[in-house]
Amino acid sequence: WIMGHMVNSIAQIDEFVNLGANSIETDVSFDKQANPEYMYHGTPCDCGRDCLHWENFNDFLKGLRKATTPGDSKYHEKLILVVFDLKTGSLYDNQAYDAGTKLAKNLLEHYWNNGNNGGRAYIVLSIPNLNHYKLIAGFKDTLKNEGHEDLLEKVGHDFSGNDDIPDVEKAYKNAGVTGHVWQSDGITNCLPRGLSRVKLAIANRDSGSGIINKVYYWTVDKRSTTRNSLDAGVDGIMTNYPGVIADVLSESAYKNKYKIATYEDNPWETFKP
C-alpha cells in the first residue's frame, strides 16, 4: 500500500492518486463537543509540505465517496484504503466514546450513503492515544444500532503513538478488538528514525500469536529509506512522494517480491508468503 500523506482537501485526492498512491491518509480535527469538524493538519507539518490545506469533514467525505464509488465520474479504481488520522489530542479522555459515535454517524451518512452504494474503500481509524480506545466502541456500537454492522467489515484500527507493542495489545484487549489491526511506526520526514520498533511490530505480525495484521512506516520520502523499509518487510509506506515508492517497487530487487495492492487484497489478512 502506497499511502499518500496528509491529503486534506478534495483536490488532493486526485493529485495523490495520480502520483501513484493507492491509499491516502487524512487528518481529522474535532470541535469541543467531539464532532469531527475539519480535515486539517496545521503547522508544523512535514518539511516541504503546505500544512494548511483543509476541507469541512462532511464535504471531504462526500468527495471521498465519489472517488471510491464505481461508476462515478470522479472514481479512482486504485484508491482502496483510507487512514483517518484522528486528532483526538484536543479532546478529554471521557469524550472518546462520543467522538467514535459522531464519527460513525457522519461516515454512515456521507461516505457509506446509509449503506446504499456508498464508497467502497477500506477505512483505518488511527488513534494517537491509547487512553482513547473507547472511540472504537463508540464507532462500533453506533453502526450496530443503526443497523449497519456489516460495514464494520470495512473498518480497521491503528494506534499511532509509537507506544510499546505490549501496551498497544492491552489497549486492543480493553477495546475488544481481535483483528483488522494495522500498526504504524514513524516520525515526521524532518527527523530520522530507525527501524527497530518497525521490526518489533513485524515480528508480532509474523508470530501467529500477535494482534497485528499489517505494518506501515511513515513518513518516507527517500529511496534509501524506502528500500530499508521494504527489506524489513513492511506492508505499507506513507509518503509525500508516491512516485518515489512506486519507482523503488519497480526495481529488480523488489518487483518480484512486492506488488501494489488492489481491491482484491484483503487489508485485514496477515500476508503469508
Swiss-Prot record:
Compartments where found: Secreted
Cellular compartments per GO CC: extracellular region
A biological process term (GO) from this entry: killing of cells of another organism
Keywords, in A-Z order: Cytolysis, Dermonecrotic toxin, Disulfide bond, Hemolysis, Lipid degradation, Lipid metabolism, Lyase, Magnesium, Metal-binding, Secreted, Toxin
GO molecular function: lyase activity; metal ion binding; phosphoric diester hydrolase activity; toxin activity
Keyword Lipoprotein: no
Co-factor binding comment: Binds 1 Mg(2+) ion per subunit.
rRNA-binding found in the keyword field: no
EC number: 4.6.1.-
InterPro entries the UniProt entry points to: PLC-like_Pdiesterase_TIM-brl
Originating organism: Loxosceles rufescens (Mediterranean recluse spider)
Domain of life: Eukaryota
Name listed for the protein in its UniProt record: Dermonecrotic toxin LruSicTox-alphaIC1b
Tissue expression pattern: Expressed by the venom gland.
